[in-house]
Regions:
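Hydrophobic beta-strand positions that form the internal "hydrophobic ladder"
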Residues: 35-38, 92-94, 132-134, 178, ...
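Repeated scaffold domains used in trafficking and secretory/extracellular systems
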Residues: 1, 22-31, 74-88, 118-131, ...
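Non-cytosolic head/periplasmic domains of membrane-anchored proteins
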Residues: 2-82
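Blade-level signature of beta-propeller repeat domains, shared across WD40, Kelch, NHL, RCC1
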Residues: 205-233
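Short loop/turn segments that connect beta-strands within beta-propeller blades
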Residues: 7-11, 59-62, 106-109, 152-155, ...
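Intrinsically disordered, low-complexity segments enriched in Gly and acidic/Ser/Thr residues
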Residues: 116-207
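Structural motif
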Residues: 2-5, 46-57, 99-105, 142-150, ...
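A short beta-strand motif characteristic of beta-propeller blades
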Residues: 1, 12-20, 65-76, 110-117, ...
Length: 233
């Protein structure tokens, strides 16, 4: 496998070669917004055991001075898979796995910030921004709601738990809020867990995204779009 990076003029910035024997099978990859850093997730099979290797690279002058392949650090986790790794901003990383969520800070070299135990819950969707991470999971038998949304800061502290009983298909976070859609339902949730907006439209939703104007949102249906404004929110 090769990982190639290019500038806006299609010139090669870097080329990394990985092998299944050494690195494992690629699961996910992400690059920081400034294009200077890279995170990768690989799955390795060691006999009958599975390992995940999360590796971080820095292609700025810092990484150039460190070593030839620009790797600044890596973390090996036994009995785990991390199919989603994301830069939440230029200096922070969230890795979503089958057993936990791991967050890292990487101003220059990576440092682990938090390990958030999923407590055997299966994530149905994940979200993140520069200050928080979270996920939605099927509620346990003690809850009347279909789903529960868990919101953490990037140091791993639980900020809120939200019961969610609408249809669910997509969840994501902006810097201001969490947006959840499914079928004809849409909810906008604040990071403290309070509900900002909850509505069922008359047509199936494709997506809901914030507009450039504050408190306005573009609602995307299969055959049209509408702009809605929230008042008194």
């Amino acid at each position: 496998n090769y990982i190639n990076g290019y500038d806006k003029d299609s010139n090669t910035i870097y080329e990394l070669k990985t092998t299944i024997d050494k690195s494992g099978y690629p699961m996910d990859i992400d690059i920081s917004n400034d294009g200077q850093k890279l995170v990768t997730s690989y799955m390795k099979i060691q006999g009958t055991k599975v390992q995940s290797v999360i590796a971080m690279y820095n292609f700025s002058s810092v990484g150039q001075n460190e070593n030839a392949d620009r790797m600044m650090g890596s973390y090996t986790v036994d009995d785990a898979l991390y199919p989603i790794v994301k830069f939440t901003d230029n200096d922070n990383i969230a890795c979503f796995g089958n057993n936990d969520i791991r967050t890292y800070t990487m101003t220059e070299k990576p440092e682990e910030r938090a390990v958030i135990d999923l407590r055997s819950r299966e994530m149905q969707g994940v979200f993140y921004n520069s200050s928080c991470v979270g996920y939605i999971a099927v509620s346990d038998s003690a809850s009347k709601a279909k789903y529960k949304i868990y919101i953490y800061d990037n140091k791993g502290a639980l900020k809120a738990e939200v019961d969610y009983d609408n249809a669910f298909d997509k969840i994501y976070a902006t810097e201001e809020e969490i947006i959840v859609t499914g079928d004809m339902d849409c909810s906008i949730i604040r990071f403290n867990g309070s509900m900002k907006f909850n509505y069922s439209f008359t047509k199936n939703l494709v997506n809901v995204v914030p507009d450039s104007n504050e408190e306005e949102y573009v609602v995307i249906f299969e055959n049209e779009t509408q702009t809605i404004a929230l008042k008194g929110m």
